[in-house]
Amino acid sequence: MEYNILSCGAVADGRTNCATAIQNAVDTASAAGGGRVIIPAGQYLSGSVLLKDNVELYLESGAVLISSLDPVDIKPFPQGGNGVNPDDTADGWQSGFFLGASHAKNVTISGMGTIYGQGDQVFLDKNEDNGFHECPKTCEAFRPRMMLFEDVENFTVRDVTLKDAAFWTLHMAGCQNVRIDGIKILNDDRGANNDGIDPDCCRNVVIANCIVSTGDDAIVVKSTGPMSRRYGVCENITITNCVLHSRDSALKIGTETHGTI
């Protein structure tokens, strides 16, 4: 079954917040046992959207899904207990996330469209290195993650382009049976903290046939404090046939190493 977001009230003008329309389509598809949520060609601004069981978010060619940079529109991270504590902010747990899912299964993002994080509205070149243009740009705005998927079993991201993330691009935490295939991540090569793909305390992950260009780490396998407390080890991560470009590390294991990798 397919659910077109235009039928749920979305407006393709790049200015109207379509979060309610997109979330309604996702909720309806999941409640019906699963389905494909279609984002047709056009520009769609949105606040945070939570994907759910058995839902595929499909971006048609020419579709651009735009992350809001307004804190009011963005869901925060869970706090306290085994969640995010105040002393975890050094691990990058700030500002919430745009697209995500939590404790879900059979979630897919696919299609030939683009997810745009508006990082080019966040990173400013103040020429602090006197014209060498090598140091990270200054950050002067609210910066949500583009994606955070936590404890998702059978998670796939295929073919889409992820562009200009304001913070980490694709963060997977405690996920199992993951395939990231054929995607492009095109971020500012001087953007701070705009990691490409971050498997965090995940198991059984395949990252294949991807092009990733970032200012921070292109692919980094890690174990952050909150996710290590929840999910333990990070293991069975396969990376193959990818083209990686970074001003930091193209491929890194660690930095956040609170548990076993």
PLM regions and their residue ranges:
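Extracellular/periplasmic carbohydrate-active domains that bind, remodel
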Residues: 1-261
